[in-house]
From Swiss-Prot:
It is an enzyme of class 2 (transferase). GO terms for molecular function: rRNA (guanine-N7-)-methyltransferase activity. PANTHER family: S-ADENOSYL-L-METHIONINE-DEPENDENT METHYLTRANSFERASES SUPERFAMILY PROTEIN. It is found in: Cytoplasm. Its EC number is 2.1.1.-. The keyword Glycosyltransferase does not apply. GO terms for cellular component: cytosol. S-adenosyl-L-methionine binds at residues 75, 80, 125-126, 139. It comes from Mesomycoplasma hyopneumoniae (strain J / ATCC 25934 / NCTC 10110). Pfam families: GidB (PF02527). Keywords: Cytoplasm, Methyltransferase, rRNA processing, S-adenosyl-L-methionine, Transferase. This is Ribosomal RNA small subunit methyltransferase G.
């Protein structure tokens, strides 16, 4: 069902490469412990949700010049949300920070076998050199207070911090003093409550 929904919503994507990616996750999951998703749930909460929410996040960026966006995905694990989005939008400049070596090896395999170009940093985000990213994102990595701390040294003015969250995000906002995140609900077709906690760094 959701595999077909992906095709319907994103007709211009490289669906063959997306299928290869899904098959690679299914094949590698036993050895790398990548995700609890499989089958139709993988297409729903892994693929569709990633593309849909990343499209939404990119829409929050003021990109009147239509420049190539530089995106950092923190702790992507099996590649969510950035790899499905990269497959549908190969023009972006993607960097992934992943500290777990097994998952990092999987992401290297993804790059090679799918011929995807992205920068892979196999260490914690706190240890990477500051760069002028347009967007820093993460999904299911940490609460907002921790994300605020670990990204503090790597962003620049005008960087958009945009983190994919569930309904508990409102508690996280209350616990993150002086963080000043805005919360917006992402209307979607998978009957799931998805929120984006975001702010532009001043």
């Amino acid at each position: 069902m959701y595999k077909r929904l992906v095709q319907e919503f994103f007709p211009k994507l490289d669906f063959e490469n997306l299928e290869k990616y899904v098959n690679l996750i299914e094949f590698s999951n036993k050895n790398f412990n990548l995700t609890a998703f499989s089958g139709d749930i993988l297409w729903k909460e892994g693929i569709f949700e990633s593309i849909f929410t990343m499209n939404f996040i990119v829409g929050l960026v003021n990109n009147k010049e239509n420049k190539k966006l530089k995106i950092l995905d923190i702790g992507a694990g099996s590649g969510f949300p950035s790899i499905p989005f990269l497959i549908t939008n190969p023009e972006i400049e993607l960097t992934i920070s992943e500290s777990m070596q097994k998952r990092c090896q999987f992401l290297k395999d993804v790059s090679e076998k799918l011929d995807l170009k992205f920068n892979l940093i196999c260490k914690p985000v706190q240890e990477i050199n500051p760069q002028k990213f347009d967007i820093i994102t993460a999904r299911a990595v940490a609460n907002l207070e921790k994300l605020e701390k670990i990204t503090k040294k790597i962003h620049f003015p005008k960087t958009l911090l945009a983190f994919i969250k569930g309904p508990k995000v409102f508690n996280e906002v209350q616990n993150c003093k002086n963080c000043n995140y805005k919360i917006i609900k992402v209307n979607n077709n998978i009957n799931k409550k998805i929120f984006i906690a975001f702010k532009q760094v001043s």
